[in-house]
């Protein structure tokens, strides 16, 4: 999950995601367009909320997701790479719609989320992803911080 209320260092400032920051985006007309991709490559589509293959939800800790991977080469390779630990993190693409600054800390209160990405080189080392369930084609995010696409 994108952990709420935990600071993340991003170069010259830190960022804290506040509870509810994703709520509007997930419920909006754009929610079905949110996609899961691999390595920030839009050609490497893994799932989409509108198709039901990507499920995103806020819980008490933050934002979590599940992906039903496609029956493609990438969809078959990714669980193997995750299980081996070669691919172990996640990033996000978003546009901040609500933010407050306290000194060098940005508090995100509302974001337009447009992608989650599974990656071998996450901007946040604390992110993890895991294969879960009897079907190896389902990936579940365990801990995820938010990365602004810049």
Label each region the model flagged.
Residues 35, 52-149:
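Residue microenvironments linked to proteolytic maturation
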């Amino acid at each position: 999950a994108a952990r709420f209320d935990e600071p993340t260092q991003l170069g010259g400032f830190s960022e804290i995601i506040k509870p509810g920051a994703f709520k509007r985006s997930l419920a909006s007309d754009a929610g079905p367009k949110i996609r899961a991709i691999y390595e920030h490559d839009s050609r490497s589509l893994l799932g989409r909320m509108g198709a039901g293959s990507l499920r995103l939800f806020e819980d008490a800790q933050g934002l979590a997701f599940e992906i039903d991977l496609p029956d493609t080469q990438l969809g078959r390779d990714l669980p193997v790479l995750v299980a081996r630990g070669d691919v172990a993190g996640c990033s996000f693409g978003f546009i901040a719609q609500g933010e407050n600054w306290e000194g060098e800390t940005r508090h995100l209160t509302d974001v337009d989320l447009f992608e989650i990405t599974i990656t071998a080189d996450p901007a946040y080392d604390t992110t993890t992803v895991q294969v879960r369930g009897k079907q190896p084609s389902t990936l579940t995010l365990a801990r995820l911080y938010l990365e602004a696409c810049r």
